[in-house]
Amino acid sequence: TTHSEVSAASVAVPTVSHLEVARALMKAGVDVLIEKPLTTSLAEADELVATAARTKRVAQAGHLERFNPAVRATLPLITQPMFFEIHRLSVFTPRSLDVDVVLDLMIHDLDVVLSFVNSPLRDIRAVGLPILSDKVDIANVRLEFESGCVANLTASRVSTERVRKLRFFQPKQYISLDYGRQDVIVFSV
């Protein structure tokens, strides 16, 4: 197959190779969907974005949770989010150890929360620790928004069970979203 026959490609290689592979494809005239995380560093991400602009190609990060039916069903329910509690826990496996747990797992929840809260960030507090690898394996982030909304996110790849839940509160309402089961439970008063 020649590049002229390929209009788009999915880049699903180890993160350390994302920039090299995506750059070569874009220079060959191919749009790219890149599995998350986009790259291993901000400098590489900037270079990838610049390459896309220079070659006039589309480079899209594969933040697939935004297309999860539960996330899509929840978006219209959000009126005045006040507090989020998000847990994404995974049993340890040797995959994706080239990046920390924030870029491997939490990035999905950051993407979703930022799409749910229509307010600039005021403060970010974070802590993370390497437990079973030389990268951060467990992390907690607290996002505070100008609107007063707060989001607490925990991601871990050191767990005995898989948990992928987002819970949030707004006036007279509690909403629980399970990414894995793709369901939403709404409690209203």
Where are these regions (language model features)?
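Mid-domain beta-loop-alpha active-site segment that forms a flexible
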Residues: 62-69, 92-123
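Beta-loop-alpha module in the N-terminal Rossmann-like domain of NAD(P)-dependent dehydrogenases
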Residues: 1-49
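Hydrophobic residues in well-ordered beta-strands that form the structural core
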Residues: 34, 59-61, 177
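Contiguous beta-strand/loop segments that form the cofactor/metal-binding neighborhood of enzyme cores
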Residues: 110-183
